[in-house]
């Protein structure tokens, strides 16, 4: 039974020098050579605002060569560039370039296509159009890029361009910070075998000649370069339907599956519409409701959230939920830079937890979070996003990041937490755009009315986690004190903490939970007004904080074997009388018991109880008016159990 009580809270803090929580992540991954020098925009690229890509490719499976063109349209910002620069790896051959319809000179070196800007001044907002004709055999970009592959001996093409590998197969401004407003993707493949080209957005047309099939897909929602994708194979295609309870709109769910995976994936893929419904209820309507959602199998070990058509290397519910979650967190709102990848991956990991909670309940939710906890070093904010291994660190960018949301949820409560997510998803400046950590923090503060500087400094920019040590004792007359130490060496965490005090009142089991604000090395909290004997104190019993916890000696002598609990005698010191609470577990029944007062030499001064005592909660009182001042002992004996406490009598 949970009880509410009034309590008096005293916080005693030891003043210490605060340790700066921000520090550079020391992890060293196997840096992908394509990423070392290409994780930031050039000065000229930063002056361009891209609005459109038109990608047209012809794919030759025999030679493993692609050829075609990309139209790039955009406008000039406040400052005029010296040249127009676009990313394309050096192994690809640029055949020619047109600038505003006219053939232009260019250079292609250091994985950059450089096109001279006009000599005349270009006004702000000036629109430009560049067409780049090129061909080559795409160089596989570490774990990403354009892949000529096979499945069951049949040719298969797939792409995975995150983080910076769109440049391995098509020229672009390859950075997540600048989304094109729309993209056309036109791909020609051989007619035999019966290839299907699956891509982003809506299929506009499929035309077929004797030797070629040409697919035209169009994405009308803003999209960043790494989310543009191709998946090509003689797929088995089947459809499902999502009917929105939010808007009453209907949307097709398209599944492009390897024929040998059809039966294995079918039942889980059927759950997709239920997941869309859940996430739409929690976050707001599915962001690409006017196009589609779907899956395309590919030969890679995980999944990739390509906009409107996730590439799938498996079909577990966890994977489906994770990649679908990216539709809101990663696709509609994309991290502004890969420093902030947690806004994509941590949110998607948390979507897995929300699906587990929906399917299997609260206990399963907490179990999922515990199974995805991380207690090592490093910051959630990626200090140096130079390689995939650093950016996509599963412990930091996925697991610890999901705990940030888990903790935030408990701090503000469910109503405000999901209002934060809905407000974030519908923010006019962020929806279908890009966001940084500070953008998300601003939304959190605006919706909740709270200051989250400490929270984000600790959990996003700071290292590690709190290690709490708790001890407690009974002061007497219903007063208990709880001491919380922070033992970690990386700085002190400022967090609200649930403290649950449990015990008994006669045969009744009682507990109450209070919230304390903790922020220092050592803090002591005093609680009064409890009308039950406290037998245990637990910090964060439900597991809302990513932490380590240790307990030191408690103030109740819990004898597990005999189930006898003895409270501290109170008040102590005393001047006229003292009392002591004790409890006998009903499971062991009545006991022969003696409670005596002994003087400092161990001689019996008075016998308070010497008879058979029933199980349950009891209080014994000693009136000391006829006794001299000094040190005494109150001793309880039952069978082999003896509890002795020192008491001080003053007059």
Go through each PLM region and give its residues.
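Glycine/proline-rich low-complexity spacer/linker segments in large multi-domain proteins
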Residues: 45, 133-183, 543-556, 560
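Amphipathic alpha-helical substructures
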Residues: 394-482
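Zinc-dependent metallopeptidase catalytic helix centered on the HExxH motif
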Residues: 308-366
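N-terminal, polar/Ser/Thr-rich
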Residues: 18-67, 453-454, 458
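A surface-exposed beta-strand-loop module
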Residues: 20-21, 83-84, 89-151, 526-531, ...
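Acidic/His/Gly-enriched intrinsically disordered linker/tail segments
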Residues: 345-411, 428-431
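Hydrophobic helix-coil surface modules that form long, contiguous segments used
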Residues: 68, 161-162, 173-321, 350
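C-terminal outer-membrane/trafficking sorting elements
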Residues: 559-570, 574-651
């Amino acid at each position: 039974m949970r009880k509410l009580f009034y309590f008096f809270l005293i916080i005693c803090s030891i003043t210490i020098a605060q340790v700066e929580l921000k520090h550079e992540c020391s992890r060293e991954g196997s840096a992908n050579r394509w990423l070392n020098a290409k994780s930031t925009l050039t000065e000229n690229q930063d002056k361009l605002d891209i609005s459109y890509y038109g990608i047209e490719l012809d794919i030759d499976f025999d030679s493993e060569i692609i050829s075609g063109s990309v139209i790039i349209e955009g406008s000039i910002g406040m400052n005029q560039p010296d040249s127009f620069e676009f990313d394309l790896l050096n192994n690809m051959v640029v055949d020619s370039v047109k600038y505003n319809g006219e053939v232009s000179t260019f250079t292609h070196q250091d994985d950059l296509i450089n096109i001279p800007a006009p000599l005349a001044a270009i006004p702000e907002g000036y629109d430009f159009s560049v067409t780049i004709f090129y061909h080559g055999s795409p160089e596989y970009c570490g774990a990403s890029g354009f892949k000529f592959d096979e499945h069951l001996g049949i040719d298969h093409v797939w792409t995975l361009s995150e983080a910076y590998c769109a440049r391995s197969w098509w020229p672009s401004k390859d950075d997540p910070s600048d989304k094109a407003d729309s993209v056309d993707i036109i791909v020609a493949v051989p007619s035999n075998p019966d290839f299907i080209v699956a891509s982003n957005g809506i299929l506009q047309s499929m035309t077929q000649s004797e030797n070629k099939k040409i697919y035209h897909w169009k994405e009308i929602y803003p999209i960043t370069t790494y989310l543009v994708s191709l998946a090509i194979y003689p797929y088995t295609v089947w459809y499902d339907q999502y009917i929105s309870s939010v808007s009453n709109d209907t949307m097709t769910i398209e599944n492009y599956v390897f024929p040998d995976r059809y039966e294995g994936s079918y039942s889980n893929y059927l759950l997709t519409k239920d997941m869309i419904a859940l996430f739409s209820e929690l976050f707001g309507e599915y962001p690409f409701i006017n196009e589609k959602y779907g899956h395309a199998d590919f030969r890679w070990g995980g999944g990739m959230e390509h906009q409107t058509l996730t590439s799938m290397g498996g079909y577990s519910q966890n994977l489906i939920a994770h990649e679908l979650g990216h539709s809101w967190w990663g696709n509609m709102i994309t991290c502004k830079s890969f420093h902030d990848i947690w806004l994509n991956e941590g949110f998607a990991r948390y979507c897995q937890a929300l699906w587990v909670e929906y399917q299997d309940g609260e206990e399963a939710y907490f179990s999922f979070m515990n199974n995805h906890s991380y207690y090592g070093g490093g910051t959630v904010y990626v200090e140096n996003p130079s390689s995939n291994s650093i950016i996509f660190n599963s412990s930091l960018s996925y697991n610890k990041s999901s705990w940030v949301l888990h903790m935030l949820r408990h701090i503000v409560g469910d109503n405000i937490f999901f209002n934060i997510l809905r407000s974030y998803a519908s923010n006019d400046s962020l929806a279908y755009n890009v966001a940084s950590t500070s953008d998300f923090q601003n939304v959190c503060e605006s919706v909740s009315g709270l200051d989250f500087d400490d929270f984000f400094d600790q959990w996003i920019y700071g290292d590690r986690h709190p290690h709490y040590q708790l001890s407690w004792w009974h002061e007497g007359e219903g007063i208990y004190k709880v001491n919380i130490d922070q033992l970690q060496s990386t700085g002190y965490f400022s967090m609200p903490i649930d403290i649950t005090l449990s015990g008994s009142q006669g045969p009744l089991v009682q507990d109450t939970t209070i919230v304390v604000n903790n922020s220092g090395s050592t803090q002591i909290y005093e609680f009064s007004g409890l009308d039950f004997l406290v037998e245990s104190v637990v910090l964060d019993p439900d597991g809302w904080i990513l932490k380590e916890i240790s307990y030191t000696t408690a103030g109740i002598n819990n004898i597990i074997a005999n189930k006898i609990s003895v409270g501290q005698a109170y008040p102590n010191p005393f001047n006229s009388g003292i009392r002591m609470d004790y409890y006998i577990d009903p499971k062991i029944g009545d006991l022969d018991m003696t409670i005596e007062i002994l003087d400092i030499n161990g001689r019996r001064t008075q016998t308070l109880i010497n008879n058979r005592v029933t199980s349950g909660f009891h209080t014994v009182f000693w009136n000391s008016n006829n006794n001299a001042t000094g040190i005494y002992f109150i001793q309880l004996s039952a069978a082999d159990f003896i509890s002795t406490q020192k008491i001080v009598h003053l007059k």
